[in-house]
Regions:
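Helix-loop-helix hairpins and the membrane-proximal interhelical loops
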Residues: 3, 7-11, 15-57, 193-301
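Hydrophobic faces of alpha-helical transmembrane segments in multi-pass integral membrane proteins
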Residues: 17, 21-24, 63, 67-71, ...
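Transmembrane alpha-helical segments in integral membrane proteins
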Residues: 66-78, 142-158, 236, 272-303
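Early transmembrane hairpin of solute transport permeases
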Residues: 2-162
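Long, well-ordered mid-to-C-terminal structural blocks that present hydrophobic/aromatic surfaces
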Residues: 297, 309-312
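Membrane-interface helix-loop-helix junctions at boundaries between adjacent transmembrane segments
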Residues: 113-119, 124-136, 147-211
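Cytoplasmic-side transmembrane-helix entry/capping segments in multi-pass membrane proteins
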Residues: 84-92, 166-170, 306-310
Length: 312
């Protein structure tokens, strides 16, 4: 079981590997279009401004398409057979899931406490996935769809069918079964997600008000789970989903960077949610504590030699 959970966490990390270059380019382009940093080069309409604005728009690709990335990436690490075909099946199944939810909200949104928007803009609880107005399930929805498709794929991809049904073997059979499976998943999602929103809002306000103590607990849990390969399950919803702030901490930070750079107010007032990204400090200030732990638990006769190693 632990090995399966580790594989799941590793599969989730695949899209995260793309965040570094995307975040770097978002940051660089934001700085390049900030007049306080580059001066008159960043004036609207100049070739410099036009170039970096286009670069910045393209740099948002990963952050603006997170659900699709997670839907496609999960089979890479989890599928036992033909993972490339499983990625295609998962992508199509996720689109079907979004269309199912879109129609459910359109027909029964009033009963669910959701309002179907008249235009292609996000509303409360509603998001737009490649032109599909659907329920906002964050990255949990695509992960659930993708995991379902992976299970169906590994079970039925090599299933034997009569010769006259040969067209429906392989990926066709997997998608046929997945089609009805994600329909059931969409119905369940439509029923429970509005209640999940209430819990998420409560948790979001709680996390926003925990201060340094809460961030310390988060860092401790992340480091405790890291040896088991399970830390992705902890930080993914906080960094990349809507648990702490809409659109996730990293995407919001990148979009607000020009505003933050102009402000003279303390960062903990402007963006208190950004404290959850300060996990790197534990590596710096945790070293003296680690050294003290080594020294205090060493045998008395060996402490002098250990001190020579630890202090430098």
């Amino acid at each position: 079981m632990l090995q399966k959970i580790q594989r799941f966490g590793g599969a989730m990390f695949a899209p995260a590997m793309l965040f570094s270059i995307s975040g770097l380019m978002v940051g660089v382009s934001a700085l390049a279009t900030t007049a306080d940093i580059v001066g008159d080069l960043a004036v609207y309409g100049t070739p410099w401004y036009v170039f970096w604005t286009i670069i910045q728009r393209g740099s948002w690709t990963v952050f603006k398409r997170l659900p699709l990335l997670f839907a496609v990436a999960l089979p890479i690490g989890l599928a036992q057979k033909q993972p490339a075909r499983c990625c295609l099946e998962a992508l199509v199944a996720y689109f079907a899931y979004c269309f199912f939810l879109s129609e459910i909200i359109k027909l029964s949104g009033d009963n669910l406490g959701l309002e179907y928007p008249s235009s292609l803009t996000s509303a409360s609880g509603i998001t737009v996935i490649d032109g599909i107005k659907t329920l906002d399930t964050g990255i949990i929805g695509p992960l659930a769809v993708s995991a379902t498709v992976v299970a169906i794929h590994d079970r039925f991809y090599d299933a034997k069918v009569p010769d006259w049904l040969g067209t429906f073997s392989g990926s066709s059979l997997v998608y046929l079964i997945s089609f009805f499976a994600v329909f059931a998943l969409a119905a369940i999602s439509a029923a429970i997600v509005p209640y999940v929103y209430d819990v998420t809002d409560t948790l979001r306000h709680a996390l926003a008000g925990v201060g340094p103590f809460g961030v310390g607990i988060f860092v401790f849990l992340e480091r405790a789970l890291e040896p088991f390969g399970l830390h992705h399950l902890l930080y993914m919803p906080i960094y990349y989903d809507n648990l702490v702030i809409n659109d996730g901490i990293y995407a919001t930070w990148s979009s607000l960077l020009p505003i933050l750079s102009h402000s003279t107010r303390p960062l903990n007032e402007l963006a208190p949610w950004a404290g959850f990204t300060a996990t790197g400090w534990v590596k710096l200030f945790g070293l003296p504590a680690i050294a003290a732990a080594f020294y205090s638990t060493a045998k008395p006769e060996r402490r002098a030699g250990l001190r020579v190693i630890l202090v430098p």
